[in-house]
Amino acid sequence: MSTAAAHRVPHITVGHFYANHAETLGLRLEGASRGLNRKIREPTINRPGLALTGFYNYFAGKRIQVFGSAELSYLRSLNATTLKEKLRQLFSRNFPCLVIARNSPTPGSLLDMAAEFETPVFRTHMITMKFINAATIALEFDFAPSTQEYGSMVDIQGIGTLIR
């Protein structure tokens, strides 16, 4: 009987995610590296479009947030005062990090607000849905249950066998 038990990872840090997946996902850190110790607690991605309008009842704050064309277009439609207010409301939720898809330009106040709340911001060349799909797969691997077994591997008639 095995004494090993499957262990599901309860969280990973933003720094771990960035270090392990930056190349595959085309991630580039924007601004300071503060906040890389923040925890990602869910292996899924959120697009905070509805939250930007002020509706936070079901905001998925444990997830990586992604701005695509729709979110950035909405932000560009706001005057400077409203933009700052909306960004302050969003960043005050202390989500793990923000990813800007399509290498889209961002309002300067977005990076300023991220720095104020020490929230890492990344940029990727990938289109939004391709990034979300690839990042979700990467996160599922990071959060997958794992187990450790101690023993020796031997070859018995061409079949690998673990002897505990």
Enumerate the predicted regions with their spans:
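Glycine-rich phosphate-binding P-loop
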Residues: 157-164
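Gly/Thr-rich phosphate-binding loop signature of adenosyl cofactor/nucleotide-binding cores
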Residues: 2-91
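Glycine-rich nucleotide phosphate-binding loop and flanking beta-alpha elements
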Residues: 73, 105-106, 160
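Charged, amphipathic alpha-helical linker segments immediately N-terminal to NTP-binding catalytic cores
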Residues: 94-97, 101-139
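Structural motif
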Residues: 65-67, 98-99, 162
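Residue-level recognition of alpha-helix initiation/capping sites
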Residues: 81, 103-105, 145
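Pre-Walker A adenine-sensing motif
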Residues: 142-154
